[in-house]
Amino acid sequence: MREYLFSESQKKGAVMRVLIFDTETSGLPVWSSPSDDPMQPHIAQFTAVIFDDASGEEEEYVDLIVRQEWPVAPEAFGVHGITPERSIEEGVPEDHAVMFFEAMSAAADRIAGFSLSFDMRIIRIARLRAGRAKGLLDAEAAVQKAKQFDVMQKCTALCKIPPTEKMMATGRKTWKQPTLVEAVRALFGEEMADAHDARGDVLATKRIYMHLKGLGLA
């Protein structure tokens, strides 16, 4: 794995850098439990890209399969399809994903994702598991919040997906927040061939981000 370092000149350049990242996991987070609960899921795949906000030119890219040394929920495997064999053959320790996220987020001016709160929670779980201090993460989260941009929330009004019956039953008549597949279909009239692969999700999210940028919404 290539060592990932940013020089001070890169960090201080005039270019606005955007980090988009995505995780596939061993299961869903237990939202009602603390992030350091041992029952919280692990990262199965971590993909991230840093690019120039103006041109979209990619500066850094990483795609990691994480070695699964813990049970994987059947429903999670059904989503991302990362087999135990592939995990063992290609996988790296989970803290590698943590280190890449920390380096890339420090170098970025904006952190973006599709349903960003999910992936930020997964990263927090992994960072605590890797021994990062909770107090430090809490302080950092307060700073990072200003840098965060949720592509899903920003494109909801553009996608114009009607509310579901469940939403209507509870009096919610706003547009439904799209899945990434639905957003690509609504905005570009295309079907995603590689949905729920972190690499495919990152590239699709970047495409939507640049579309929003062109409309003055990002």
Placement of each model-derived feature along the sequence:
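N-terminal accessory regions of nucleic-acid-interacting proteins
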Residues: 1-23, 27-33
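Metal-dependent phosphoesterase core characteristic of DEDDh/y 3'-5' exonuclease domains
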Residues: 4, 9, 17, 39-84, ...
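Short loop/turn and capping residues at structural boundaries
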Residues: 31, 88, 195-196
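Glycine-rich, highly charged phosphate/nucleotide-binding loops
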Residues: 89-98
